[in-house]
Amino acid sequence: MHQVGSTNMMKIQSIAQLSITMDAGTKILVVGDVRGRFKQLFQRVEQVNKKAGPFEILCCVGDFFGEDKQNEELIAYKNGFKHITVPTYILGPNQREHEKYFENLTDGEICTNLTYLGRRGVYTLSSGVKIAYLSGLEAQGTADSAGSEHEFTKADVIAVRNSCLVSKNCSTEYRGVDVLLTSQWPFGMQEKENATASKLVSFLCREIKPRYHFCAINGTHYESAPFRMPKDETTQFELCTRFISLAEVGNAEKAKYIYALSLKPVDKSRLLDLAQKTTNEIPCPFIGLDLGGAIGKNDSSENRQYFYDMDGGRRKRQGGDNNKRDKRPRIPQIEQDKCWFCLSSPDVEKHLIITVGEHFYLALAKGPINKHHVMILSTKHVPCAAQLSPDDWKELNKFKAALRKFFKTLGQVVCFTERHYKSVHLQINALAFEEGYAWKIKHSFEDKAEEFNLEFETLPALDSEKMLPEMGPYFLAELPDDSTLITRQMKHFPIHFARDVFCSENLLNCDEKVNWKDCLLDKDEEVAYVEDFRKAFAPFDFTDD
């Protein structure tokens, strides 16, 4: 075991070197192609876990399943006769014949402690470690959508790239992700190019700048010297990547198929540590590659503007006229006196207002699901939380914290949602649920997302406006477990999606209240709701301080 660079990362080379003195960090195992050798894999993992664990997660790249006869080894684990000791997450199929093993899975679960990650996305561990993943092989041809479940396309790669950039921490500098998992090799990684290399994977690696990139399917173990991704619009730092290809489990050559590391999340690492150079670095293999056939110019650069802090006034671009202001898509404007939610508008229903702060006010929702259904709205004309100033954000968090404390006294937890799509004024819905229902909320969102064919990414607790896409539509839900669900898939997004979730059978079981227009109250009822809420909320109302 040896330390790599000056970062908190440890590499484990053999069972004799697996020490219980690994640096404090998130311990992760990664293995190459399993191909049905489940018994051999999980016995080996159990040994490693006892020697140098506990490990938080085991990630499998390449082919997890093998021939039908070989796959029978998994039956004992499905039936509970054998147990998987480390939570294991696998990538999807790389061949059509294996697609059947990934069908009809509930929440991706194959058996206890064995889960299919999905086609692509970003998985964030409880420690904050971010793992980007892309299943399958690059689809042949120019289609934007894959013809089968074992293929990925440009659209999938762009989606992963955007998910990584939108989930960046509050720092103005993008720091990369901790791990990238693909089955396919990136093009350009070796001088003698292999036939299965993908230019799309090269593009993805270059864009999201992982500290570690793991892949498989070539049947060989290969580790390159570390290399640095070129700086771009997302960061002025050249971030370091280590590429590792893992061999097949149980290979005759006894080539390395398992890799262990301990990571401190990039978002909690010092930029100086991430930028610290080592003595054995090589030039980035992706510089100078012609990726034009895989990614168009608009996809590779222009669309990126929606996901990072442009901040042109404080950070100079590479080349060009630094005095020119960044050009951003203009936000449709609407006169404040015609906005229903601006306090200065004659149309605002002031009898719904519970309390008013400097930047925000709290009001009863129009057509509420119940008498505790409230909204946090900006006093001024701001379209979404992503465009709030630091002072605005600070007060918004005070309102959220006050509501959490208030509902806790009632034995309830609260969920906050924001839908920014063709909206002109920031509205954040807050709805409380009995504490015993807290665990059901995320599952209910996932169920409805599947019903409407939506894909969400999971982020840590929302602690800065810079975690949100500065431009472009999105929907988010802040859950009681301090995680955040977010999607930018807003085309044909259901207008009542949040209410669909809240009113579902698993939660409030009141489908008749999905449409707010079906829940309109008489003005006298609204006034009574507001007065009752204001009185109960008074001990937590900081606006009078």
From Swiss-Prot:
One of its GO terms (molecular function) is RNA lariat debranching enzyme activator activity. One of its GO terms (cellular component) is post-mRNA release spliceosomal complex. GO terms for biological process: mRNA splicing, via spliceosome. Residues 306-329 are annotated as: Disordered. InterPro entries: Cwf19-like (IPR040194), Cwf19-like_C_dom-1 (IPR006768), Cwf19-like_C_dom-2 (IPR006767), HIT-like_sf (IPR036265). Coiled coil: none annotated. It comes from the Eukaryota. Belongs to the CWF19 family. This is CWF19-like protein 1 homolog. It comes from Drosophila melanogaster.
